[in-house]
Amino acid sequence: MGSEMCIRDRMMGVFSGVLAALKRNTVFDFIPMAIAMIGICVPTFLMGPLLVLIFGINLEVLPVSGWGQLPGDKILPSLTLGFAYAAYIARLSRGGMLEVLNQDFIRTARAKGLTERMVVIKHAMQGGLIPVVSFLGPAIAGLLAGSFVVETIFQIPGLGRFYVEAAFNRDYTMILGTTIFFSAMIVFFNLLSDLAALWLNPRSRDAS
């Protein structure tokens, strides 16, 4: 489940952060950053029950359990698990973009007559999203850890739920195997994010 959420949350967070940076001090900046602050402050184990209480019990507009069985049954688990990480990525994207947009090479690109779209996509985003790429490794670790809680709350048949059930049943073989798998995934994605950040940053490549 965590792997499914990673790409979607990164895209949503990057879009919100880049938009907030380009529209600084406007409603397109204030509203996404206010929502991002809420997502950062509210932990996963509290966000899940709150969403279930509001949308599943009180409003009765979304199912509160299952995965792939009913229309809309992926919405609440996705929001619970991915909201906080999309919020972190949005703030990182905004900060990175604001820093890059004030650099001399951006002013030079604009002075050459490049369109604002080309300046943002070709020049600004490459440097502005380096903090997001560096955050990918810890984000994957957090998504994997958060899947334990979310899969248990929403009764999703994933590795996180199996891990929790194995702990209650004292199934040490399952606990050991799942721990090794999660550890290998975390190490792999940390290495991948470091390599991607090195590739995106020319100064790091020159120093190495």
Residue ranges and their predicted role:
Residues S3-E4, R8-V27, T44, W67-S208:
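Alpha-helical transmembrane segments of integral membrane proteins
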Residues R10, V27-G39:
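N-terminal signal-anchor/first transmembrane alpha helix
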Residues A34-P63, T80-A84, R91:
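Membrane-water interface segments at the C-terminal ends of transmembrane alpha-helices
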